[in-house]
Amino acid sequence: MNDCDLIVVGGGPAGTTLATLVKKHAPGRRVILLEKAPGPRHHIGESLLPGLVPVLKEMGVFEKIDGAGFPRKLGANYVWGRDRAVWENDFNDVNIKEMLARHGKIPEKIEYAWQVRRSEYDEILLRHAQSTGVEVRRGAVATGILEDGERVAGVVLAGGEELRGEFLADCSGQNGFLSRFRRIREYNPQLKNVAGYAYFKGAPWKYRFSGHPDKTKIFVCSVACGWFWYIPIAADEVSVGLVTSVEFL
């Protein structure tokens, strides 16, 4: 006998988005979301794209995100390849003819996204999911899977509790919950990269590279060993990281 209709492993944006939308479109279904962290947790992946705006609106959480005080992101600037000139990309540069040809209509114009502190952003999404009726279990660590033939029927939690569901969604991100237990995880050797990052305060705002405190851009710069990111996440704080190969380190 199932304990619920859907078990979601992982309380990041993927898990909260899925859980929220399932409850919206099937309010009678019981959805249990398992998040291993007992409270808000640090994470990278701080520069968002405008393509998620329609999703946030469908979830009913757009106003909460837009009103949270995150710096608005208007685009991206790059220094990439042999030509070291700055390549500017603005979200509001819309090619009307191209959009008409591709979609047959002009979709909603979205001019910005946000640069976010993930502990705050993810917490807003998690609390919103809970407010829609999703059963959120914090500090719930899934340590194994329950199998019914070839079917994954549920999870085993730390402490031995078994939880069964009609469906199981692995939204654990890099943790790769299901792929580890099913031993089906494979790495692309060309993408075996690592990232080192830190946060800096007091860095000058450079409009050419990032913008100004309420209207920013991510700045991406290629270097011989990989590439750097420069993401303004607050009025006086930037996230700076280097992505490079394992061999370089």
Residue positions per predicted region:
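N-terminal Rossmann-fold NAD(P) dinucleotide-binding loop
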Residues: 15-16
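Glycine-rich FAD pyrophosphate-binding loop
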Residues: 7-9, 20-44
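Charged, glycine/proline-rich intrinsically disordered loops and linkers
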Residues: 85-109, 209
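Extreme N-terminal starter segment of soluble prokaryotic enzymes
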Residues: 2-6
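N-terminal FAD cofactor-binding segment of flavoenzymes
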Residues: 41-87
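Predominantly flavin-linked oxidoreductase catalytic cores and closely associated redox partners
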Residues: 123, 127-249
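N-terminal Rossmann-like dinucleotide/flavin-binding domain of flavoprotein oxidoreductases
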Residues: 44, 58, 67-68, 117, ...
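Short beta-strand to alpha-helix junction loop
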Residues: 98-128, 249
